[in-house]
């Protein structure tokens, strides 16, 4: 069955607008995806008809809002096949989720002389928290290097592990290269050394189904805004036994059991002990609607369509004069490139004049830019609402830029 891309596009009102007098070609979903009417309407309806502070309220609106919020927790747990909804913590996004793990689990479990393994392709969100933790604890941060094609040099991974390795923190899919890392093999190796595993799933969950039980990872984190949901909301999955042992890292309302000026404070059970303060309930409702939306379309069908579009895009872009494409042939979601010696910012500015939105810069992956020896790259990302015609416009735009700039 053909993927109904035009029907999908009709659900996204922003795709009807023009930029610089031309139809918008939005090729920046890896930074943040656009939102369908179903998400916009669900969040709006909550604020119009159902808003109240959650937890402890006895009135109808509060009870219903709390129930709606917890239903999304259950829904998200099914989405990634967690064993229990109580393994999921609502966070602001992937960055906060990783920082939570670093400041809670990491503070309790990392000692001087221990080491943490990351890769050279990580987003800053999966580098900086571990740098801070290692500096504070006197631990070592070890790095898996890259092959020129943008895949990890897995033959070096075994040598990085030893009996002081406490954590492997790895991206599921690179936000620059689109590389999907072989998590089962990497996690199996970590298990041989008794190390925990954190997976940054920010660039994976919108492209195919994720099964955290099958992966057997300890932590999995993703953001709602890349999954066609609202900003300011994300999910941190932690294996239940591990989560129950972790101390809170933020204090305040809703995360306590009792508070006494003389007897101290006791914590709520997990996951609520990690959700201090008033939550982003509207964002949570919107996230639930986003999960409903992609589930109704079928992640397998979305993935098949996106892969067909990716193959077409790579074939067509390879014909652009003087273009350099970065990353492996088999990839998910993104195509990073440079055009001759022209700065990515200039190329992106020209494309914007043609109504084409791409991302330019270091993509929060400065170590990766350094490895390739470039200050920046352009990045076009492909989502379920993109079309062959938009790819053709990108190719035509780049060909025109090459002709203009030489």
Swiss-Prot record:
Catalytic function, reaction form: (sulfur carrier)-H + L-cysteine = (sulfur carrier)-SH + L-alanine; L-selenocysteine + AH2 = hydrogenselenide + L-alanine + A + H(+)
Short name of any one Pfam family annotated for the protein: Aminotran_5
Requisite cofactors: pyridoxal 5'-phosphate
This protein's GO CC annotations: cytoplasm
Residue numbers bearing the N6-(pyridoxal phosphate)lysine modification: 226
EC number of the protein: 2.8.1.7, 4.4.1.16
Chain segments annotated as coiled-coil in the UniProt record: none
Transmembrane segments: none
Active-site residues (renumbered): 364
Localization, UniProt: Cytoplasm
Keyword list, A-Z: Cytoplasm, Lyase, Pyridoxal phosphate, Transferase
Highest taxon above the source species: Bacteria
Main localization (coarse): cytoplasm
Record-level Gene Ontology MF annotations: cysteine desulfurase activity; pyridoxal phosphate binding; selenocysteine lyase activity
SUPFAM superfamilies in UniProt: PLP-dependent transferases (SSF53383)
Subunit record text: Homodimer. Interacts with SufE and the SufBCD complex composed of SufB, SufC and SufD. The interaction with SufE is required to mediate the direct transfer of the sulfur atom from the S-sulfanylcysteine.
Name assigned to this protein: Cysteine desulfurase
Organism expressing this protein natively: Salmonella dublin (strain CT_02021853)
Phylogenetic classification of the source organism: Bacteria, Pseudomonadati, Pseudomonadota, Gammaproteobacteria, Enterobacterales
Gene for this chain: sufS
């Amino acid at each position: 069955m053909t993927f109904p891309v035009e029907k999908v596009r009709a659900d996204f009102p922003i795709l009807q607008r023009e930029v610089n007098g031309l139809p918008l070609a939005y090729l920046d979903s890896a930074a943040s995806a656009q939102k369908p009417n179903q998400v916009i309407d669900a969040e709006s309806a909550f604020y119009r008809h159902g808003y109240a502070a959650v937890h402890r309220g006895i009135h109808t609106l509060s009870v219903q809002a709390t129930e709606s919020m917890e239903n999304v927790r259950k829904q998200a747990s099914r989405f990634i096949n967690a064993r229990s909804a109580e393994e999921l913590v609502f966070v602001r996004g992937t960055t906060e989720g990783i920082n939570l793990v670093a400041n809670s689990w990491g503070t309790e479990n990392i000692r001087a002389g221990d080491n943490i393994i990351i890769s050279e392709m990580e987003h800053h969100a999966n580098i900086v928290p571990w740098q801070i933790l290692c500096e504070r604890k006197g631990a070592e941060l070890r790095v898996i290097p890259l092959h020129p094609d943008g895949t990890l040099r897995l033959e070096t991974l075994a040598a990085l592990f030893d009996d002081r390795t406490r954590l492997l923190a790895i991206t599921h899919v690179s936000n620059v290269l689109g590389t999907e890392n072989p998590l089962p093999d990497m996690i199996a190796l970590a298990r041989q050394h008794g190390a925990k595993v954190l997976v940054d799933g920010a660039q994976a969950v919108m492209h195919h189904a994720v099964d955290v039980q099958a992966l057997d990872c300890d932590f999995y984190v993703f953001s709602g805004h890349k999954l066609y949901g609202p900003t300011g909301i994300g999910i941190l999955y932690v294996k239940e036994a591990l989560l129950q042992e972790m101390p809170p890292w933020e204090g305040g309302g809703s995360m306590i059991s009792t508070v006494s000026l003389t007897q101290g404070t006791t914590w709520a059970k997990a996951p609520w002990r990690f959700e201090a303060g008033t939550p982003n309930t509207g964002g949570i409702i919107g996230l639930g609607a986003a999960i409903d939306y992609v589930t109704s379309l079928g992640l397998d069908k979305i993935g098949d369509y996106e892969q067909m579009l990716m193959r077409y895009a790579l074939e067509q872009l390879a014909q652009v004069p003087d273009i350099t494409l970065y990353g492996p042939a088999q990839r998910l979601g993104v195509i990073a490139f440079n055009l001759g010696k022209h700065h990515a910012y200039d190329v992106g500015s020209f494309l914007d004049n043609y109504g084409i939105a791409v991302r330019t810069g270091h993509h929060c992956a400065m170590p990766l830019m350094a490895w390739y020896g470039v200050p920046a790259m352009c990045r076009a990302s492909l989502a379920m609402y993109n079309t062959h015609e938009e790819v053709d416009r990108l190719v035509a735009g780049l060909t025109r830029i090459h002709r203009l700039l030489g």
